[in-house]
Amino acid sequence: MTKNLDDIGLKSVADHYDLFFVDLWGVVHNGIELYKDSTNALEKLLEKNKDLVLLTNAPRPNHDVKNFLKKMGLEEKYYSKVYTSGEAALNYLTSNFIDKTFFHIGPPRDFGLFNDFKKNKIQKISEANYLLCTEIGRAHV
């Protein structure tokens, strides 16, 4: 059964777990600034020798997100393990679709991660083996 920790906090269960997967956007930061309560919680977990893994669905490589967190003022000790959906997608595509053609749906700023595939990017969607969607919003539907 899932336990709601809203009233009692993470500290009520922290001693029972060694590993914490923590989402970034909306949990650790809002895209502009860090949430002080969240960074305090991360500090408490590290003081208890807990393992932290920070996750995000950003279509960026892990190192770009680490640089972003550094610029926001987060100490490196908190983000030694960052995993992005962009990095996961890149690894999967490299293993399975490196020689296939694709059509990119999304803003140009999100394409940098996939530069190794640039030669396979095509302009006619009907000729694509797959779609690479880095954003699906009103402008793209």
Regions found by a protein language model. Give the residues of each.
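HAD-like aspartate-dependent phosphatase fold
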Residues: M1-R138
